[in-house]
């Protein structure tokens, strides 16, 4: 009997260890505040003022195309650009009268626009990606090489210089009869690490006495919660909401000269953002997206021979007998009834219900998204939809 008893003991030990680990995990989750599960980091819902990207643009030429470039008769700017580039390189292509030679008709050159994004705190010598897009009637940029092109900012200064081979996501194939097949967009491409930063943006953070936090979705409640979270962390009245989209932080004495450390600590704080009740519908694709706080007031709906009645009945929920925790609360029981017969009268809805409950009732009948969009627009027109309806 003893060997069997020892085997049973060895089998029970891992089970006890798992139960103990599960108990510790449950206790740990129970100690965590409920807000932490729905909270987001400040860095995920806001930006720091001054820390942003900058747009760059440039004009250049792509060469080396396989007879898929611009036709110089239809794109005179390509001819002028090619002429100016060759003259700067010491190549004379003008006749005795000074006019551009009519024999200059290459098919492997295309005029393009270059766009790029300059990340914040980019230093000289770092590389950034650039996008290349055809301007003329070029059919395909695949295999072409972008010549040296300066990229300028909104202030007219050159911040980067781009050059390299263009990679496209499409292609064009044509036959002798004139028929062609195009896949993707062969007239737009990308050059990974195709530009070198030549000028840095002048921005110094160490001397700042205050920092502003810019919310990506401005909201009064969210900005106040961010200020409260920062003040709770710093232990003083250092942050205040200026408007729904801005929270101003005064740099504490302990962070003077170390603003980067302050922003590092602040962006890790968690805040539960508040959202405005909104319903977004896309009539083209039939997509419906709704927020959590969407509610419907008293309304009766009928579409053709379809009648929907929504009622809510309050019920009392009590904890089990001899329970140490729990309170008696009142909950709403929702009842959705749908009649498809003719001759039914509209029923008045006496209480507010969520839009999700209404949509679930309609979906159970197989009503398509486009009919749902029509119903939602009618509810909004009646003033019963307590949310913003945005139609794309």
From Swiss-Prot:
* Highest taxon, organism lineage: Bacteria
Record's subcellular location: Periplasm; Bacterial flagellum basal body
Q: What does this protein's UniProt record list under function? A: Assembles around the rod to form the L-ring and probably protects the motor/basal body from shearing forces during rotation.
This protein is called Flagellar P-ring protein
Supply the source organism for this entry: Paramagnetospirillum magneticum (strain ATCC 700264 / AMB-1) (Magnetospirillum magneticum)
One molecular function GO term is: structural molecule activity
Entry's family note: Belongs to the FlgI family.
Q: Known InterPro entries for this protein?
A: Flag_FlgI
Q: Quaternary arrangement and interactors, per the entry?
A: The basal body constitutes a major portion of the flagellar organelle and consists of four rings (L,P,S, and M) mounted on a central rod.
- What does the organism's lineage look like at the top? Bacteria, Pseudomonadati, Pseudomonadota, Alphaproteobacteria, Rhodospirillales
One GO cellular component assignment for this chain's record is: outer membrane-bounded periplasmic space
**Gene encoding this chain?**
flgI
GO BP terms, alphabetized: bacterial-type flagellum-dependent cell motility
Sorted alphabetically, the keyword list is: Bacterial flagellum, Periplasm, Signal
Q: What HAMAP family does this protein map onto?
A: FlgI
Q: Which residues form the signal peptide?
A: 1-38
């Amino acid at each position: 009997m003893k060997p069997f008893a020892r085997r049973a003991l060895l089998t029970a030990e891992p089970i006890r260890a798992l139960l103990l680990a599960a108990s510790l995990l449950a206790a740990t989750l129970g100690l965590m505040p409920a807000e932490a599960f729905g909270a987001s980091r400040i860095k995920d819902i806001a930006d720091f003022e001054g820390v942003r990207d900058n747009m760059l643009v440039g004009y250049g030429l792509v060469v080396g195309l396989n007879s898929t470039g611009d036709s110089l008769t239809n794109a005179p700017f390509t001819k002028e650009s090619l002429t100016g580039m060759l003259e700067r390189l010491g190549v004379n292509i003008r006749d005795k009268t000074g006019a551009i030679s009519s024999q200059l008709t290459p098919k492997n050159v295309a005029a393009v626009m270059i766009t790029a994004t300059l990340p914040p705190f980019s230093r000289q010598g770092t590389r950034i990606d650039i996008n290349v897009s055809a301007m003329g009637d070029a059919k395909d940029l695949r295999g072409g090489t972008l010549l040296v092109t300066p990229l300028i900012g909104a202030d007219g200064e050159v911040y980067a210089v781009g050059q390299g081979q263009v990679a496209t996501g499409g292609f064009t194939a044509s036959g002798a009869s004139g028929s062609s097949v195009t896949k993707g967009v062969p007239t737009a491409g990308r050059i990974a690490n195709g530009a070198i930063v030549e000028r840095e943006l002048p921005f110094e953070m160490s001397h700042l006495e205050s920092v502003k936090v810019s919310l990506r979705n401005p909201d009064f409640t969210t900005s106040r919660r961010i200020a409260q979270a920062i003040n709770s962390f710093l232990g003083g009245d250092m942050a205040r909401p200026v408007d729904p989209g801005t929270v101003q932080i005064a740099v504490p004495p302990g962070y003077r000269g170390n603003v980067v450390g302050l922003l590092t600590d602040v962006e890790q704080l968690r805040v539960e953002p508040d959202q405005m009740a909104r319903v977004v519908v896309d009539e083209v694709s039939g997509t419906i997206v709704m927020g959590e706080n969407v509610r419907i007031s008293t309304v009766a709906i009928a579409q053709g021979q379809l009648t929907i009645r929504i009622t809510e009945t309050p019920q009392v929920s009590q904890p089990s007998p001899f329970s140490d925790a729990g309170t008696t609360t009142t909950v709403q029981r929702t009842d959705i009834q749908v009649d498809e017969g003719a001759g039914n009268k509209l029923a008045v809805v006496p209480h507010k219900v969520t839009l999700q409950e209404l949509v679930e009732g309609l979906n159970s009948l197989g009503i398509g998204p486009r009919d749902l969009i029509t119903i939602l627009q009618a509810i909004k027109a009646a003033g019963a939809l307590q949310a913003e309806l945005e139609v794309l």
